[in-house]
């Protein structure tokens, strides 16, 4: 090593090593901070994906519930149409009976 050099050259070498070491420590610290930010960002992305998946499941349930409600409403509509037809027939028959009754009473 530099053990045989002059004290002045050893001091310069020591300062140079300290400077390089400080630079490397700073770079390493910066890299650790960047890595930590990336891990936290990845963790947040994972949270967001989980929340999106939960929201998607809720939306799917809402859609299924809506489909079920629409099926029930279609059945109710069909029943109401049958009832309307029956009422209409009864009104027509009532009108015919009224005419027959009026004819008999004359």
From Swiss-Prot:
Gene Ontology CC terms: BORC complex; cytoplasmic side of lysosomal membrane
Key words, A-Z: Lysosome, Membrane
Membrane recorded as keyword: yes
GO annotation (BP), single: axon development
Keyword Membrane set for record: yes
Principal place of residence: membrane
Subcellular location: Lysosome membrane
Classification via Pfam families: BORCS7
Source organism, top-level taxon: Eukaryota
Subunit structure: Component of the BLOC-one-related complex (BORC) which is composed of BLOC1S1, BLOC1S2, BORCS5, BORCS6, BORCS7, BORCS8, KXD1 and SNAPIN.
PANTHER family per UniProt: BLOC-1-RELATED COMPLEX SUBUNIT 7 (PTHR31397:SF3), BLOC-1-RELATED COMPLEX SUBUNIT 7 BORSC7 (PTHR31397)
UniProt similarity note: Belongs to the BORCS7 family.
Note, other: Diaskedin is from the ancient Greek diaskedazo, meaning to disperse.
Functional description taken from the UniProt entry: As part of the BORC complex may play a role in lysosomes movement and localization at the cell periphery. Associated with the cytosolic face of lysosomes, the BORC complex may recruit ARL8B and couple lysosomes to microtubule plus-end-directed kinesin motor.
Name the UniProt record assigns to this protein: BLOC-1-related complex subunit 7
Native source organism of the sequence: Homo sapiens
């Amino acid at each position: 090593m530099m053990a045989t050099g002059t004290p002045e050259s050893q001091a310069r070498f020591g300062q140079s090593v300290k400077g390089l070491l400080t630079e490397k420590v700073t770079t390493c610290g910066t890299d650790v901070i960047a890595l930590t930010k990336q891990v936290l960002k990845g963790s947040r992305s994972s949270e967001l994906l989980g929340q999106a998946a939960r929201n998607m499941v809720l939306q799917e349930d809402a859609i299924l519930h809506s489909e079920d409600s629409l099926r029930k409403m279609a059945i109710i509509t069909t029943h109401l149409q049958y009832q309307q037809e029956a009422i209409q027939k009864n009104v027509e028959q009532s009108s015919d009976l009224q005419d027959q009754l009026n004819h008999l009473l004359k």
